[in-house]
A protein has these predicted regions:
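N-terminal Sec-pathway targeting helices
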Residues: 1-15
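Functionally critical loop-and-helix segments that line ligand-binding/catalytic clefts
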Residues: 29-53, 173-223
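Substrate-binding cleft of extracellular glycoside hydrolase catalytic domains
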Residues: 29-55, 60-146, 150-152
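Hydrophobic anchor at the start of a short beta-strand
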Residues: 88, 155-157, 179
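Glycine-rich, charge-decorated loop segments at or immediately adjacent to ligand/cofactor-binding or catalytic sites
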Residues: 100, 165-173
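Structural recognition of alpha->loop->beta junctions
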Residues: 108-128, 170-191
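Aromatic-lined carbohydrate-recognition surfaces of secreted/lumenal glycan-active proteins
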Residues: 153-167
Length: 223
């Protein structure tokens, strides 16, 4: 009887372990170290000297920051990249100093006229100084933006931030959004679609640039 009881306990532990792994599989996994697809993210801080030398498979361009700022290089970079067959996506640098609705409207206006190839990205690395909100309020604001993206683009946006910031604020709340890990030169524990692997020199672009490795199939980040 004792042996049988131990056997059942062992089986229960095994089943629980499998269930736990399955439950968290959507957010915890190993990095795909064999990926050879890379992309860059650019803004007005970057200078592209020769687009013909840029061999990236995809590029994410800063479109807006907050509710008022629009990046002056967005449309020019987008046209030049797409002309050379590079897939283009846009990202918003989200702030906590204005509403999600206002920020989405700004993003939507800034990207008008550009047929984006990739799912939009919310870049939310920190809260705006002087406008800090609770974790719950932050999640509500991000969810509003997610819903607006889904309504207008047909897909939920990708969330970009560091692992500590994601774990503290979003883990378990945004499993319906893909994650872009912003931890440079660091191991990745969370499941991610994209990893900002390092900052390095890329042919055709002046100075160093964010170098991002794809950790999924390219079609998974396409619109």
């Amino acid at each position: 009887m004792k042996k049988l009881k131990m056997k059942y306990m062992a089986m229960a532990v095994m089943v629980l372990g499998i269930a736990t792994v399955s439950f968290f599989a959507c957010r915890f996994t190993k990095e795909n170290k064999d990926s050879n697809i890379y992309g860059v993210d650019l803004s007005h801080h970057n200078c592209v000297e020769d687009w013909d030398q840029v061999t990236a498979s995809f590029v994410y361009l800063k479109a807006t920051e907050g509710a008022t700022h629009q990046d002056e290089t967005f449309k020019r970079f987008a046209h030049n990249a797409q002309k050379r067959g590079i897939l283009v996506g846009a990202y918003l640098f989200m702030t906590t100093s204005s509403s999600s609705e206002e920020q989405f409207q700004n993003f939507h206006q800034a990207t008008a006229g550009i047929k984006m190839d990739l799912i939009p990205v919310i870049d939310i690395e920190r809260q705006t100084k002087g406008y800090k909100v609770s974790g719950n309020e932050l999640r509500k604001r991000v969810r509003v933006f997610v819903n607006l993206c889904k309504k207008h683009y047909g897909k939920n946006p990708i969330i970009y931030c560091s692992q500590p910031f994601y774990t503290k604020n979003f883990l378990g709340h945004f499993n319906d959004c893909q994650y872009w890990c912003g931890d440079v030169n660091a191991p990745v524990v969370l499941y991610h679609a994209i990893h900002q692997k390092t900052i390095k020199k890329v042919a055709g672009i002046k100075g160093n640039v964010d170098y991002n490795i794809l950790n999924c199939k390219l079609k998974e980040i396409q619109l």
